[in-house]
Amino acid sequence: LELVDKMGREFYLSELLEPLEKRFDFIILDCPPSLGLLTLNALCAAKEILVPLQCEFFALEGIVKLLQTYEQVKKRLNPQLWLLGVVLTMFDGRNRLTRQVQDEVNRCFPDQIFKTVIPRTVRLSEAPSFGKSILHYDIKSKGSEAYLSLAKEIVMRKPGSRTATAE
């Protein structure tokens, strides 16, 4: 779709999703790692954002830009937008850079970090090449366990959630 010159282009996705909101508890929009029109549309359509952060040096620069964009969108376009949290991905606790990134993120965003981290594993890397989610590819893998744990944490963080709903 050519939205570049359309009035209200940042709300196009929001308008498309509106009829679906009553049918689903969650609608997940997986955005590209850029801050283009697709991501802007997703930020305008979303109620919460979950930021996956790879445990790599340049990811820290990217999160700063993303959070600046988040603040601008919240202020000007979508006042109901809420930062659900940041989840560390491709986590390898044996790697010094991973631990440095974790420390820096904990220092900068102490209240926004999920306890669950998504590990760097071969099984997580293999699953997409078979056209499967990690839960369908290997339910007993560390990656599956991590994503299930993250899902429970997400449910617990949502406004109005109760302990019983996460089980």
Regions found by a protein language model. Name each.
Residues L1-V4, R96, Y137-I139:
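Acidic, proline/glycine-rich intrinsically disordered inter-domain spacer in sigma factors
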Residues Y12, K65, A146:
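Charged catalytic carboxylate motif
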Residues E15-V122:
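Conserved catalytic-core segment of NTP-binding enzymes
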Residues E104, S149, I154-E167:
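P-loop NTP-binding site
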Residues P119, S125, L135:
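Nucleotide phosphate-binding site architecture
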Residues P128-S149:
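C-terminal boundary of histidine-terminating zinc-finger modules
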